[in-house]
From Swiss-Prot:
Part of the 30S ribosomal subunit. Interacts with proteins S7 and S18. Binds to IF-3. Pfam families: Ribosomal_S11. One of its GO terms (biological process) is translation. Signal peptide: none annotated. SUPFAM superfamilies: Translational machinery components. This is Small ribosomal subunit protein uS11. Located on the platform of the 30S subunit, it bridges several disparate RNA helices of the 16S rRNA. Forms part of the Shine-Dalgarno cleft in the 70S ribosome.
Length: 130
């Protein structure tokens, strides 16, 4: 009984990407943090749901902080050191996610707000009556 040898079993090499972009999409219900290279290829991402939060707790600043930490930890493995942050949305996790990225050792060079503003487009949802 001969043992079969695997031919061409090569280890996948990781690309070192020192500079990139961080996209923070902060809605009222969730926050999604995506770290990419300068071309837009995704290096790492995390959301409040993947950080272990469910339901209305996903919309909190603490959940956004934990999601940004998780994404930064994944991106640090591929050598990401410096990012430009692009923030989109009105959610409460905007500032918390940026502060968490800075605290996790990633150098933030610029912060841009790219929230889309309608020129009187779609009708907004009706007011809540509680």
């Amino acid at each position: 009984m001969a043992v079969k040898k695997r031919a061409g079993a090569k280890k996948k090499e990781k690309k070192v990407i020192p500079v990139g972009k961080a996209f923070v999409q902060a809605t009222f219900n969730n926050t999604i943090v995506t770290l990419t290279d300068l071309q837009g290829n995704v290096i790492a991402w995390a959301s409040c749901g993947t950080a272990g939060f469910k339901g209305s707790r996903k919309g909190t600043p603490y959940a956004a902080q934990m999601a940004a930490q998780a994404a930064a930890r994944k991106a640090a493995e591929s050598g990401l050191r410096q990012v430009e942050v692009l923030v989109k949305g009105p959610g409460s996790g905007r500032e918390a996610a940026i502060r968490s990225l800075q605290a996790s050792g990633i150098n933030v060079t610029a912060i841009r707000d790219v929230t889309p503003i309608p020129h009187n487009g779609c009708r907004p949802p009706k007011r809540r009556r509680v």
